[in-house]
Amino acid sequence: MAGYRKLGRPTDQRKAMLRNLVTSFLKHGKIETTETRAKETRSIAEKMITLAKRGDLHARRQVLSFVTEETVVQRLFEEIAPKYAERNGGYTRIYKVGPRRGDGAEVVILELV
């Protein structure tokens, strides 16, 4: 079994989509997407928050290599990471919204706790 979900896309498209989802999630604090995308986004976002909690230059550069906007990285290190300083993981929550009207895909809201 693979260690990640393929999401029905070639590798480059999948990575680009996940980078955009993680960036939007950290920028807005919550996103609405399908369940499998949310689960994949959650795992990456939690790793980014854990990196940001370290707070050193190397961690910032590692996050910058994945997150597409510098303002989001700044928000992650100055606002989000200090908020979770005492928490060991579990920074996100997934709420089920229901099926999407167009194709019946299960839609969820992914948000920061």
Curated annotation (Swiss-Prot):
Pfam family, any one: Ribosomal_L17
GO molecular function: structural constituent of ribosome
GO BP terms in the entry: translation
Record flagged with keyword Ribonucleoprotein: yes
Keywords: Ribonucleoprotein, Ribosomal protein
Protein's UniProt keywords contain Ribosomal protein: yes
Gene Ontology cellular component list: cytosolic large ribosomal subunit
InterPro entries from the UniProt entry: Ribosomal_bL17 (IPR000456), Ribosomal_bL17_CS (IPR047859), Ribosomal_bL17_sf (IPR036373)
Subunit structure: Part of the 50S ribosomal subunit. Contacts protein L32.
UniProt record similarity statement: Belongs to the bacterial ribosomal protein bL17 family.
Name of the protein in question: Large ribosomal subunit protein bL17
Annotated gene: rplQ
